[in-house]
Amino acid sequence: MNKSKAQQIFGDNAEAYANSPVHVRDDSLDIIEKMLAGYNFEMALDVGTGAGFTAISISNISHTVLASDPTRPMLEQTRKTSISANSANISVIQNIAEQIPISTNTVDLITCRKAGHHFPEFDKYIHECSRILKQKGILIIADSISPENEDLDQWLNQIELERDPSHVRNRKLSEINMILNKYHLRTVEHQLTRIHLSFNSWVDRTGVSKSYKNHIQQKFINAEPHIKEAFQIRSIDKDILFSWPCAVMKCVKSV
C-alpha cells in the first residue's frame, strides 16, 4: 500500500470508514460468505482489513484470524468492532500488504476486500499470498475493478485518484488474472457485482475540500453519455448515484 498517503487518508478518516455502509456490508461480503460456506480454517489472514468487517466475518469459520493493515487508527477500529461482535479470535498486525510477516506455507485462507486498489505493488502482494498460503490454501479477492475499455478505465482511475490520493489503480480483470496465474493461484469461482455509491458520502469519507468536491462533481455531471451509462451515473435530489464494477474471486494455490 502507498503507506504515507494511505496512512494519512485512512488515519484521519478511520471512523468515517468504520461507519460506511458499503464497507460494513455489501454484496461483496455476502458473496464471500457464500463462497466459503461449509469451510473451517485453522489460520486466516485479512489483508487491508480497514475496520475489520471481513475479518469478523471469517472469524466465524476460522480458529485464528490475523487482521492486517498499515494504518494504526484503522486497527484500533478493528479492535473496537471485533469486541462489539464478540470475535475474540482476532488479532491485529500492522504491515503493508507487500511485506507480510508470516512464515511460508502456514496460512489456510487469505481475504482482501476493497483494499487491493491501494496496493502500489499488487504483483508483489500476490506473490506474498502465494508464499504464505499452504498448498490448496484459498485466496479471496473482492475489489472494485476497471472495465477493459481504455477510455472507461482512464476516466474511473483518474476520478478515484482525484478523490483519494492513496488510490493506486482499479485493475482490469484481465490484469488480475494474469498476475494470479503467474503465481500459481487458480481461480475456481468468481462473480461480478456492483458497488453502489452516493457521491456526497463517497467524497466526504476522504475529507476533500468543498471547492475540490465541486470540481469532482462537475466531472460526473459533464461525463460523456457512454461513461454515465457504464457507471450508472444519475443525479437525484442534491446527490449523484453511481456504481463501480466489482469482482469477487476465489482462488486456490495449485503448487
Please place each PLM-identified region on the residue numbering:
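Short alpha-helix
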Residues: 169-184
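A short glycine-rich, Lys/Arg-flanked "PGG" loop and its adjoining helix->strand segment in the class I
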Residues: 123-138
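Short catalytic micro-motifs in class I SAM-dependent methyltransferases
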Residues: 114-115
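Class I SAM-dependent methyltransferase SAM/SAH-binding core
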Residues: 45-99
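Conserved class I S-adenosyl-L-methionine
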Residues: 1-39, 53-57, 74-77, 140-162, 201-203, ...
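Conserved Class I S-adenosyl-L-methionine
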Residues: 188-255
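A conserved beta-strand element that flanks and buttresses the S-adenosyl-L-methionine
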Residues: 111
